[in-house]
Amino acid sequence: MHAWLFALLAAAFVLYTDDYVIAGILPELANDLGVTEGEAGQLVTVFSVTVALAAPVAAVALARAPRRHLFAVALLVFVAANAAAASTPSFAVLMVLRIVAAFAAASTTPAIFAFAARHAPAEKVGRYIAVVALGVTGSIAAGVPVGTWVGSAFGWRATFTAMAVAGALVLLAVFVTLPRQNGPDETPVLREQLRILGRRPILLGLLANCVLMTGSMMMLTYLAPYLAAATTAGVEERALTFSLSGIAGIVGIWLGGIATDKWGADRTLLFGIGAIVATMIALWALWAARPAPLPVVLAVATVWGGMAFWNSPAIQARLHLLAGPVSGQALALNTSGTYLGVSIGAALGGLALSGHGVGALPLTAAGFALGALVLLAFARQADTATHQMR
């Protein structure tokens, strides 16, 4: 595999860590800037919302920009925003700087995946996407904990300084390793871009990803209350569950990439989503038989953690294949759908927890996974019909 692929992995790791890392330094940041922790938490919200809204717009507006230049400029803006965040005394200014950093991430993240897929050998598209996606799971498993440790040891401003330094190193790696282009990417006119993106197989696939993420994040967001209700697990055991799920996610995303190349996206998704449904039903059964044996719950949660990330390479490889010359724009919309699913999942999970208790969470999540499977079946049917018409 090429050196530039690992530079893009590092870029994904840094960009996603920057989104989530604030969660670990909220108390210190809020106290220093004179705001409540709830207000400080909006720094995470505004970053995620900005990425979700800006990613498709940036993908269309910057479609013809040489990728090497796009990544370099965006990462430079990212570095500057984090360096400034490390020294600002104002919460309002920090909020603006988070929006600036989010714009940089929005213009870069989908393009990174599209670049990896476009420059991968045909038989290794899934694996190339999986390598970059390891940066996403790695940010959750390692980036956020390390950023939190830096903040607790040296102050919250040191976390932003560390992000700026990491961004600068990634900028250097990308600029050195990424191949030069002879000219701008050939991109269809806007009307043709919208026509391609509006095809039913693509729209249904995008919706399926959003629905699948809604169910997955519903369970992940409220996994701690589930463990507390279904088992006798304490804080340490709950932390172990999250750690095992995170490690399984790293393994799952790599195996999902290999499966995509060997089985194809559709079979990979059928297996992955089917496994999610099975683990959700198992978690419900364990809750119904509470107190459930902790080792069994740990095993099921670990399998679920792996399967939750298994599907990502297949979803993106499928969109890349269907969207062709506008795969970057399709993956940007997929990024928006992912963030939307995260938000909806947390909200609906809270409603399910309040209205029906912990036991409703795994069954509701299983329902969303089945819904995603149905949407993907319709998407495949629509794609088959389109090819027959040709």
Where are these regions (language model features)?
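Helix-breaking motifs and short loop linkers at transmembrane-helix boundaries and internal kinks
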Residues: D32-G34, P66, S87-V93, T232, ...
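Conserved MFS/SLC helix-loop-helix module at the cytosolic interface between two early adjacent transmembrane helices
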Residues: L53-P89
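Helix-to-loop junctions at the C-terminal end of transmembrane segments
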Residues: A54-R67, G252-A265, L353
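Primarily marks hydrophobic transmembrane alpha-helices of the MFS/SLC 12-helix fold
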Residues: R68-F71, L94, L269
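Paired small-residue
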Residues: V77, A81-A84, A92-A101, P295-V303
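Helix-loop-helix hairpin linking two adjacent transmembrane segments in secondary transporters
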Residues: F91-V93, P121-P179, Y226
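Cytoplasmic helix-loop-helix junction between adjacent transmembrane helices
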Residues: L97-V136
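C-terminal transmembrane helical hairpin of 12-TM major facilitator-type secondary transporters
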Residues: R267-A314
